[in-house]
């Protein structure tokens, strides 16, 4: 089984502080642990994104916030794009 490396964009790294303040960091960490091992596993469901984020995926942290990530298969890496808000960049 492949375990993917995780990298964070600058925005995602800043989002971690917001998650901690909102007490959502444990839920986000559980999702990151899941996608590190199986990025396409359902449940929990994920959504393929379109437009500017085409090629990225989204999973719900809560009703307002999403984990947005890209799977870089060749590098065996998951790039975390955002952890806060609902696709507002």
Model-derived features: positions:
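A short, surface-exposed loop/turn module that caps and links secondary-structure elements
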Residues: 33-59
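Enriched for short, Lys/Arg-rich terminal
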Residues: 2-18, 22-29, 50, 59-66, ...
């Amino acid at each position: 089984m492949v375990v993917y490396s995780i990298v964070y964009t600058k925005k995602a790294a800043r989002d971690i502080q917001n998650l901690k303040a909102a007490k959502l960091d444990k839920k986000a960490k559980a999702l990151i642990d899941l996608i590190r091992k199986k990025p396409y596993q359902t449940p929990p469901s994920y959504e393929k994104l379109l437009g500017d984020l085409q090629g990225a995926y989204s999973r719900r942290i809560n009703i307002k916030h999403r984990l947005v990530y890209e799977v870089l298969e060749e590098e065996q890496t998951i790039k975390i794009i955002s952890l806060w808000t609902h696709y507002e960049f």
